Amino acid sequence: VAERQAGAAAPDTPGTRDTPGTPVASDTPDARASGAFDRDTAVALERSSDSEAVFAAEVSSDWRAGRGPHGGYLAAMLLRALSEGLSITTSGRSTGAPRSLTIHYLRAPDPGPVQIRVKLERAGRSLSTLSAQLERNGTPLALALAAFSVPWSAPEIADLPLPDVAPPDPVRESGRLLHPAAPPFTRHLILQPRIGAVPFEGSEQPMEIGGWLGLAEPRPVDALSLAFFSDALFSPPFLRLHEPGTSPTVDLTVHFRTSLPRVADPDPGELCFARFRTGIVHEGFFEEDGVIWAQDGTVLAQSRQLAILMALPKR
């Protein structure tokens, strides 16, 4: 399982070709920016064949959440490997933007080197599917399945408007962090809350949170950052708790709803708006449904995860 923890802001991922090396950020359009996010989600090709590519990567302690790395951080790392794997295993014949990513978190890896084994499950002219396994010394840590596709011709229908909230603050910075237990990954996040009560104060308001968010180091929004954002806010059930808790993610699905970048020269400092809702906490499990919008109201991504609501261990 991958984790999120107590930190929150106040309202107001035939032949063998060997290319060993140190993980480096991809040169693909989704990863041209430099900075901590691209450095710490970087992958390096170790070997490949017609149907498989194996990458080296490094799990950084800077993205820790609770007892393990942040789930959205691992999602971005896996998505980067899957995107690279599509190009490598099909020799560039299959293209398309990521449309769906599902991850099951098996074990929380400690910081250090890992491998990501990407397999081409199906290559189509329009839609391709790949799987990936994050592992260390042969032990699986996470399993992923992703679909990539070019746009299809269909009527444009939208019935999911951007919530009526105040625009982003003029100064690009986070709201006040409320709790000293805020995990390390929050240092990489800009969060300006707009929806939801203060966590861990036993609110009776709906389990709904939302706010403007982005990476602390300005970087154009792309599929990799959206994978991270899909798990970046504190869990909505935290609003109902009276004590800090943690919420390990069992599985996470992200649907990418538009091709990125949407313009030729995207603003690296632009924030997007994310809203997450929970309806049921039962037998320790809860669902979390999310939507991420661009500032012009375009839906960029939707997400859903199953997580476990847990109290922090007593010290």
Positions of predicted regions on the chain:
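Terminal targeting signals and extreme-terminal segments of soluble enzymes
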Residues: V1-R315
